[in-house]
């Protein structure tokens, strides 16, 4: 067995943890959180219904996650986030919006996918603005790698989709190559897809567009 620690796609930075975020984290995580487990979970049982299940990896502060879930009450959403301020912020938003179709798993996405989620259990996967790790020596830390995409495919139902959005051209090119190399995935566009109506424009994205940044969406579906 290798003694090398796994390469992580994130760094747990000690960011500002507001009183409201901390309070939400401590008081609401038992209600809306799903504890990490090395055993598979039944999402239908957790949500109390049979409905399409969408996974979001890296929900940030939760603004987009909550907006999408609020606009689509017919679907169930599972967010994965590791940074405490973001977890607290998302929990606070869930409570204020009264959402019953959104839960969060505060753990490493790769471990969640490997242990908790079963094969062909997801109807869609969102990865919006992952850390681009722009320096060449850090490219190995990028989340979108062939082995990880293969794992995502295993968890997607046939006909399910994988949606990645990034404002880094180099990361978009990298992701397009990795996704196109996965034989089970089919690109819905010639290269980059138009932004679908369900993905709202974030404040971060609007600022970037004013500065001339191009946002690129990649949407692939799993072959039936």
UniProtKB/Swiss-Prot annotation:
Give the residues annotated as active site. 131
Q: What is its EC number?
A: 2.1.1.33
The record lists substrate as bound by 135, 167, 202-205
In this chain, S-adenosyl-L-methionine is annotated as bound at: 56, 81, 108, 131
Which is a Gene Ontology cellular component entry for this protein?
A: tRNA methyltransferase complex
Swiss-Prot/TrEMBL catalytic activity: guanosine(46) in tRNA + S-adenosyl-L-methionine = N(7)-methylguanosine(46) in tRNA + S-adenosyl-L-homocysteine
Root EC class: transferase
Functionally, this protein is described as follows:
Catalyzes the formation of N(7)-methylguanine at position 46 (m7G46) in tRNA.
InterPro entries xrefs: SAM-dependent_MTases_sf, tRNA_(Gua-N-7)_MeTrfase_Trmb, tRNA_methyltr_TrmB_bact
Q: Mind telling me what this protein is named?
A: tRNA (guanine-N(7)-)-methyltransferase
The Swiss-Prot or TrEMBL record annotates one GO molecular function as: tRNA (guanine(46)-N7)-methyltransferase activity
Q: Encoded by which gene?
A: trmB
Task: Provide this UniProt record's keywords sorted from A to Z.
Answer: Methyltransferase, S-adenosyl-L-methionine, Transferase, tRNA processing
Cite the Pfam families for this sequence: Methyltransf_4
Family membership, please give it: Belongs to the class I-like SAM-binding methyltransferase superfamily. TrmB family.
Gene3D superfamilies, from UniProt? Vaccinia Virus protein VP39
Metabolic or biological pathway: tRNA modification; N(7)-methylguanine-tRNA biosynthesis
């Amino acid at each position: 067995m290798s003694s090398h620690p796994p390469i992580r796609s994130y760094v747990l930075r000690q960011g500002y943890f507001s009183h409201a975020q901390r309070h939400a984290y401590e008081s609401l995580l038992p209600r809306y959180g799903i504890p990490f487990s090395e055993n598979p979970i039944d999402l239908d049982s957790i949500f109390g219904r049979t409905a399409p299940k969408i996974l979001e990896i890296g929900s940030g502060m939760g603004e987009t996650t909550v907006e999408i879930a609020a606009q689509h009450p017919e679907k169930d959403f599972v967010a994965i986030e590791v940074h405490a301020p973001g977890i607290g912020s998302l929990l606070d938003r869930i409570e204020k919006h009264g959402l019953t179709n959104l839960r969060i798993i505060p753990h490493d996405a790769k471990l969640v996918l490997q242990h908790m989620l079963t094969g062909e259990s997801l109807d869609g996967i969102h990865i919006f603005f992952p850390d681009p790790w722009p320096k060449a020596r850090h490219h190995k830390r990028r989340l979108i790698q062939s082995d990880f995409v293969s794992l995502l495919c295993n968890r997607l139902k046939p006909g399910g989709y994988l949606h990645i959005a990034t404002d880094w051209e180099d990361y978009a090119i990298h992701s397009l190559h990795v996704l196109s190399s996965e034989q089970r995935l089919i690109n819905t566009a010639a290269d980059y897809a138009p932004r679908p109506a369900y993905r709202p424009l974030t404040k971060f994205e609007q600022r970037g567009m004013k500065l001339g940044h191009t946002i690129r969406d990649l949407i692939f579906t799993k072959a039936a």
